[in-house]
């Protein structure tokens, strides 16, 4: 929004032209989201406590989690609020990339909000019925996938980028819709499964978003894109604003979510952030890279699939409890140790993912 004001003011002083630079607006977007989160955080936490909107803890979970019962949840509202304000202020509202991301965050945030509402207000630990949650997620993801496919303006927007192979970028055609759908829904649920310990989900989310900010910037410049053999996507630089807003909002939330957590993000945060990462990966044509950089999310999801599959087929469990972070808790690892080690894994995987841009 301020881009248009700055464009007008540039007529009177050329100094305002600095607002036309994506990098400058990205930094301001990060700082805006961070400061808003830090400012609104205590107020939101106090409000959630007064409304008795506290975490519902399963009785069959680790005993160490029983002390978390009643901790304010739905803190994802803080994250979403910070992202929306930052993007609306510093993003180019004429960009379809911006509006796609706001739709993703808003729609999946609403699904998560309904789920959290049923859990904390109606005291239903299962929340929104799984079938309805999946239907709503699918509807939102398909709307996004169809929109992106039908409005694609250049071949690069529907290519599949394969890491390590510079000349392997097949055109997907209508398969793009299927891939986009599974990427967005899968990423949304993967982050949701990871959000089980204090700060466990938000830090990898911040790291992946920061990496995608760089990739979006490179994709928006023809010279960088050609040099790295990635699709040149004009206008994708506006995704940098969204990514840095996620980074700022995430760091602000981590201030209150770090162990021992004062607030949890709830499904309103995890479902929307996961979907956002998936949508960004689709927009910059890096779905496979998301699997690498978001390896912690993949690991958590695969552990659940293996656990359920093994129990149904063989009647035996592979892990003491799934997702896998609970397995390590039950092995005796203190919660902070599990969290920090998963963060370290995430740092390694994000750096590995970025390295693939050059290793082709």
From Swiss-Prot:
<dbReference type="GO" id="GO:0005886">
    <property type="term" value="C:plasma membrane"/>
</dbReference>
<dbReference type="GO" id="GO:0009252">
    <property type="term" value="P:peptidoglycan biosynthetic process"/>
</dbReference>
<keyword id="KW-0961">Cell wall biogenesis/degradation</keyword>
<dbReference type="InterPro" id="IPR000715">
    <property type="entry name" value="Glycosyl_transferase_4"/>
</dbReference>
<protein>
    <recommendedName>
        <fullName>Phospho-N-acetylmuramoyl-pentapeptide-transferase</fullName>
        <ecNumber>2.7.8.13</ecNumber>
    </recommendedName>
</protein>
<keyword id="KW-0460">Magnesium</keyword>
<comment type="pathway">
    <text>Cell wall biogenesis; peptidoglycan biosynthesis.</text>
</comment>
<dbReference type="GO" id="GO:0051992">
    <property type="term" value="F:UDP-N-acetylmuramoyl-L-alanyl-D-glutamyl-meso-2,6-diaminopimelyl-D-alanyl-D-alanine:undecaprenyl-phosphate transferase activity"/>
</dbReference>
<dbReference type="Pfam" id="PF00953">
    <property type="entry name" value="Glycos_transf_4"/>
</dbReference>
<dbReference type="InterPro" id="IPR003524">
    <property type="entry name" value="PNAcMuramoyl-5peptid_Trfase"/>
</dbReference>
<keyword id="KW-0573">Peptidoglycan synthesis</keyword>
<keyword id="KW-0132">Cell division</keyword>
<dbReference type="InterPro" id="IPR018480">
    <property type="entry name" value="PNAcMuramoyl-5peptid_Trfase_CS"/>
</dbReference>
<feature type="transmembrane region" description="Helical">
    <location>
        <begin position="288"/>
        <end position="308"/>
    </location>
</feature>
<feature type="transmembrane region" description="Helical">
    <location>
        <begin position="338"/>
        <end position="358"/>
    </location>
</feature>
<keyword id="KW-1133">Transmembrane helix</keyword>
<dbReference type="GO" id="GO:0008963">
    <property type="term" value="F:phospho-N-acetylmuramoyl-pentapeptide-transferase activity"/>
</dbReference>
<feature type="transmembrane region" description="Helical">
    <location>
        <begin position="168"/>
        <end position="188"/>
    </location>
</feature>
<keyword id="KW-0472">Membrane</keyword>
<keyword id="KW-0808">Transferase</keyword>
<keyword id="KW-0812">Transmembrane</keyword>
<dbReference type="GO" id="GO:0046872">
    <property type="term" value="F:metal ion binding"/>
</dbReference>
<keyword id="KW-0479">Metal-binding</keyword>
<feature type="transmembrane region" description="Helical">
    <location>
        <begin position="132"/>
        <end position="152"/>
    </location>
</feature>
<keyword id="KW-1003">Cell membrane</keyword>
<dbReference type="GO" id="GO:0071555">
    <property type="term" value="P:cell wall organization"/>
</dbReference>
<feature type="transmembrane region" description="Helical">
    <location>
        <begin position="263"/>
        <end position="283"/>
    </location>
</feature>
<comment type="function">
    <text>Catalyzes the initial step of the lipid cycle reactions in the biosynthesis of the cell wall peptidoglycan: transfers peptidoglycan precursor phospho-MurNAc-pentapeptide from UDP-MurNAc-pentapeptide onto the lipid carrier undecaprenyl phosphate, yielding undecaprenyl-pyrophosphoryl-MurNAc-pentapeptide, known as lipid I.</text>
</comment>
<dbReference type="GO" id="GO:0051301">
    <property type="term" value="P:cell division"/>
</dbReference>
<feature type="transmembrane region" description="Helical">
    <location>
        <begin position="26"/>
        <end position="46"/>
    </location>
</feature>
<keyword id="KW-0133">Cell shape</keyword>
<feature type="transmembrane region" description="Helical">
    <location>
        <begin position="199"/>
        <end position="219"/>
    </location>
</feature>
<feature type="transmembrane region" description="Helical">
    <location>
        <begin position="236"/>
        <end position="256"/>
    </location>
</feature>
<keyword id="KW-0997">Cell inner membrane</keyword>
<dbReference type="Pfam" id="PF10555">
    <property type="entry name" value="MraY_sig1"/>
</dbReference>
<dbReference type="GO" id="GO:0008360">
    <property type="term" value="P:regulation of cell shape"/>
</dbReference>
<feature type="transmembrane region" description="Helical">
    <location>
        <begin position="97"/>
        <end position="117"/>
    </location>
</feature>
<keyword id="KW-0131">Cell cycle</keyword>
<comment type="similarity">
    <text>Belongs to the glycosyltransferase 4 family. MraY subfamily.</text>
</comment>
<feature type="transmembrane region" description="Helical">
    <location>
        <begin position="74"/>
        <end position="94"/>
    </location>
</feature>
């Amino acid at each position: 929004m301020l881009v248009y004001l700055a464009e007008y003011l540039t007529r009177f002083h050329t100094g305002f032209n600095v607002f036309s630079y994506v990098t400058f607006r990205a930094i301001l977007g990060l700082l805006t989201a961070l400061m808003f989160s830090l400012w609104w955080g205590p107020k939101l936490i106090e409000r959630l406590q007064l409304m008795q909107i506290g975490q519902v803890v399963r009785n069959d979970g680790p005993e160490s989690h029983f002390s978390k019962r009643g901790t304010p949840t739905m803190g994802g509202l803080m994250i979403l609020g910070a992202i929306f304000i930052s993007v609306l202020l510093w993003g180019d509202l004429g960009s379809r990339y911006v509006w796609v991301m706001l739709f993703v965050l808003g729609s999946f945030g609403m699904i998560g909000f309904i789920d959290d509402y049923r859990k904390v207000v109606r005291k239903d630990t299962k929340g929104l019925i799984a079938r309805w949650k999946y239907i709503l997620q699918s509807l939102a993801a398909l709307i996004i996938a169809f929109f992106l496919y039908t409005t694609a303006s250049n071949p690069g927007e529907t290519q599949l980028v394969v890491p390590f192979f510079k000349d392997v970028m097949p055109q997907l055609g209508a398969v793009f819709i299927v891939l986009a759908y599974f990427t967005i829904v899968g990423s949304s649920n993967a982050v949701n499964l990871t959000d089980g310990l204090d700060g466990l989900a938000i830090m990898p989310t911040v790291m992946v978003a920061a990496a995608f900010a760089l990739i979006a910037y490179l994709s928006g410049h023809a010279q960088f894109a050609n040099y790295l053999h990635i699709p040149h996507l004009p206008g994708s630089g506006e995704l940098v604003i969204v990514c840095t807003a996620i980074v700022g909002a995430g760091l602000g939330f981590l201030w209150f979510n770090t162990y021992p957590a004062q607030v949890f993000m709830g499904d309103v945060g995890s479902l929307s952030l996961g979907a956002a990462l998936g949508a960004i990966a689709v927009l910059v044509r890096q779905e496979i890279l998301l699997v690498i950089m978001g390896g912690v999310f993949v690991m958590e999801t695969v552990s659940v699939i293996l656990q359920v599959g093994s129990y149904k087929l063989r009647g035996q469990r592979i892990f003491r409890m799934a997702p896998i972070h609970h397995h390590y808790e039950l092995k005796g690892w203190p919660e902070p140790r599990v969290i920090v080690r998963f963060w370290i894994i995430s740092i390694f995987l994000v750096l590995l993912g970025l390295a693939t841009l050059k290793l082709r």
